[in-house]
Amino acid sequence: GSGRTDAGVHALAQVAHGDVPESIGMSGEAWANALNACLPLTIRVTQAEEVHPQFHARFDASGKVYRYRIWRPRMLSPFEADRAWHLYGPLDVDALRWCCEKLVGTHNFIRLSANRGDMPEVERRTLPEKTTRTIHSAEVRECGEVLELEFEGDGFLYKMVRLIVGSMIHVARGREPREWFASLLSDPNGKQSNQTA
């Protein structure tokens, strides 16, 4: 696929590729139907088509978008149970918007990501190119009962969005000043954020 998703994350428009011998001779629609017959109902192939042999879903992705949904009323709707984070209580939405403004650009996200274990920690700490990513846009939207945080970037590190959102909420609840969040982006040598959404 074009990327991994953390546990509990839903993917929309996820692109994947596979190498299939031409001798099979199935149309894209036939492939989609065959795959859907084998997949659980929570996963659907909406389109399948032939692509250039050199195409790679992950390396040819032009960008990725994460949308984090926060349900704010006292009682969580059963329809939102595995689709939103339930956070009842006051949140400073202006602080969330301020954090979003700080996110846009290219930053070293070492303090806002986790080590999956696929690279030594010393490498993560000494090679900033391994943990530097570009965020093209970051927005806060109030959609009725739901607050949506949306991030578009060239790619995301392991648990990066969960740590960004958790840290933003920490500021929006008044538990840390806004400058703390800014320092997570500007000072790669500081303490790792442990505020996971």
Can you say where each PLM-predicted feature lies in the sequence?
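Structured-RNA-binding interfaces characteristic of tRNA pseudouridine synthases
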Residues: 1-197
